[in-house]
Amino acid sequence: MLQKIADQRSYLTAAHNTLTALEKKLDNDYGEIEHNNNVIEYTVDGVGRYVVSRQPSVMELWVSSPITGPSKFGMVEKKFVEKKNGMEIMKYFEMEMERIKRMLGNR
């Protein structure tokens, strides 16, 4: 039981740090960002809305992308990696931002 509490605390800290870092990364000229109740909504005109949310019961972050669809990121050594391909969440968003740039013509 104590291990589960420690794991949950570690997850909550890592999730908070990751959401804070994502909020900074997404604060750019492409869209508008809202961060409320541990959910980030990032809306890009002409592309759609991203949603990033904590899922404490399974210790994951879930992402909904208007470009690539849904993804689940599990915690590995205090970082979140995509469950299907192992990509770290910050790298995932770097790639998404590149796709947005191409879609919007580098505006």
UniProtKB/Swiss-Prot annotation:
* Keyword presence, Cell cycle: no
User: Where is the protein situated, by its record's location annotation?
Assistant: Cytoplasm
Quote the InterPro entries the UniProt record gives: Frataxin/CyaY, Frataxin/CyaY_sf, Frataxin_CS
Q: Name one GO biological process term.
A: iron ion transport
Q: Which GO terms describe its cellular component?
A: mitochondrion
Q: Which GO terms describe its molecular function?
A: 2 iron, 2 sulfur cluster binding; ferric iron binding; ferrous iron binding; ferroxidase activity; iron chaperone activity
Swiss-Prot/TrEMBL keywords: Cytoplasm, Ion transport, Iron, Iron transport, Transport
A Pfam match is Frataxin_Cyay
The entry describes its oligomerization and partners as: Monomer.
Q: What role does this protein play?
A: Promotes the assembly and repair of iron-sulfur clusters by delivering Fe(2+) to proteins involved in these pathways.
Family membership, please give it: Belongs to the frataxin family.
- What is the protein named? Frataxin
Q: Which organism is it from?
A: Trachipleistophora hominis
Q: Which gene encodes it?
A: YFH1
